[in-house]
């Protein structure tokens, strides 16, 4: 039997089609596993990944649900009021809207009026943001370009 007739035989074509089909099924199965793994990881991290929201991005749902979030912007000038040894009340603004923050705890050295700040906490039933941790920002050097641009849109970043 010549080699040409062997390659053109129907049984060889069937075997090659089966192998091709098997490879395709393996690739599709791997893609499915990767998609499922990505979905599970995204689902598991949806509440742990917390970027900050500026006051103008806070929704009524955020306030009503009282879930933890990060509020970012600038400490509004003229609003800082120290209460007792470790308490402070101030407003975080993006020059579109502002939110009142009530915080009790260690206040970072970089915390001051006009300075960038991210406050971790939640909204209470009265709609005040109860801070659990203050992250004072030195300047826009520590922000992503997108974040600095969002803040600069409404307020000049002070150095």
Swiss-Prot record:
Does the keyword field hold Heme? yes
ATP-binding as a keyword of this entry, yes or no, is no
Q: Which residues form a coiled coil?
A: none
Q: Give GO MF terms, alphabetically.
A: heme binding; metal ion binding
* Residue ranges of the TM segments: 24-44
Q: Which residues lie on this side of the membrane: Periplasmic?
A: 45-159
Q: Which InterPro entries match?
A: CcmE, CcmE-like_sf, NA-bd_OB-fold
Q: Example GO biological process term?
A: cytochrome complex assembly
Q: What membrane topology was assigned to this protein in its record?
A: Single-pass type II membrane protein
**Residue spans, topological domain Cytoplasmic:** 1-23
Q: Keywords in UniProt for this one? A: Cell inner membrane, Cell membrane, Cytochrome c-type biogenesis, Heme, Iron, Membrane, Metal-binding, Signal-anchor, Transmembrane, Transmembrane helix
Fetch the NCBIfam families from UniProt.
Answer: PRK13254.1-1, PRK13254.1-5
Protein's job: Heme chaperone required for the biogenesis of c-type cytochromes. Transiently binds heme delivered by CcmC and transfers the heme to apo-cytochromes in a process facilitated by CcmF and CcmH.
Q: Which HAMAP family match?
A: CcmE (MF_01959)
Q: Which family does it belong to?
A: Belongs to the CcmE/CycJ family.
What is the name of this protein? Cytochrome c-type biogenesis protein CcmE
Q: Which organism is it from?
A: Bartonella henselae (strain ATCC 49882 / DSM 28221 / CCUG 30454 / Houston 1)
């Amino acid at each position: 039997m010549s080699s040409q007739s062997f390659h053109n035989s129907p049984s060889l074509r069937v075997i090659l089609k089966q192998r091709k089909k098997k490879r395709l099924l393996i690739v599709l199965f791997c893609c499915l596993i990767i998609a499922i793994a990505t979905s599970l990881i995204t689902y598991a991290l949806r509440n742990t990944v917390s970027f900050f929201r500026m006051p103008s991005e806070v929704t009524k749902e955020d306030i009503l649900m009282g879930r933890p979030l990060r509020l970012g912007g600038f400490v509004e000038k003229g609003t800082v009021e120290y209460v007792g040894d470790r308490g402070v009340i101030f407003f975080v603004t993006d020059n579109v809207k502002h939110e009142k923050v009530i915080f009790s705890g260690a206040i970072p050295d970089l915390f001051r009026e006009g300075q960038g700040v991210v406050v971790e906490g939640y909204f209470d039933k009265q709609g005040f943001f109860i801070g659990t941790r203050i992250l004072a920002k030195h300047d826009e050097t520590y922000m992503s370009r997108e974040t600095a641009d969002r803040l600069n849109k409404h307020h000049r970043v002070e150095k």
